[in-house]
């Protein structure tokens, strides 16, 4: 049972890393900045990353593979669409990511 969970988590980590790489490419922001930096464009990229991941993972799983708290993941997911209303670049980044994710 534990081995199955480890395999499942490894698969989720692969998805996380692929999507993070794509977010980094499209946003032209280094992956490490997306993960930790609090500049507005980095936060936008992080929100887009979480929005895409939340289509395939729950908040706990995203938290486990990213190292972010569940509260951060939940806040980003819940506030994503509101933030898109005021951040044109975030909306465009998300559209590009959705074509990649399908």
List the predicted regions and their residue ranges.
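General nucleic-acid-binding
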Residues: 1-22, 97, 101
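Short, Lys/Arg-enriched N-terminal segment that forms or immediately precedes the first helix
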Residues: 25-39
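Short, amphipathic alpha-helical "recognition" segments used to contact nucleic acids or chromatin
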Residues: 42-57
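DNA major-groove recognition helix of helix-turn-helix
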Residues: 54, 77-78, 84
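Short alpha-helical "recognition helix" segments of helix-turn-helix
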Residues: 61-65
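Short Lys/Arg-enriched helix C-cap and helix-to-coil transition segments
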Residues: 83-102
């Amino acid at each position: 049972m534990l081995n199955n969970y480890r395999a499942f988590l490894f698969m989720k980590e692969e998805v996380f890393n692929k999507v993070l790489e794509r977010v980094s490419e499209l946003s032209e922001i280094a992956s490490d900045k997306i993960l930790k930096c609090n500049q507005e464009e980095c936060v936008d990229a992080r929100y887009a990353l979480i929005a895409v991941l939340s289509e395939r993972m729950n908040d706990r799983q995203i938290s486990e593979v990213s190292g972010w708290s569940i509260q951060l993941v939940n806040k980003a997911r819940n506030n994503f669409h509101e933030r898109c209303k005021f951040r044109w670049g975030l909306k465009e980044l998300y559209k590009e990511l959705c074509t990649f994710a399908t």
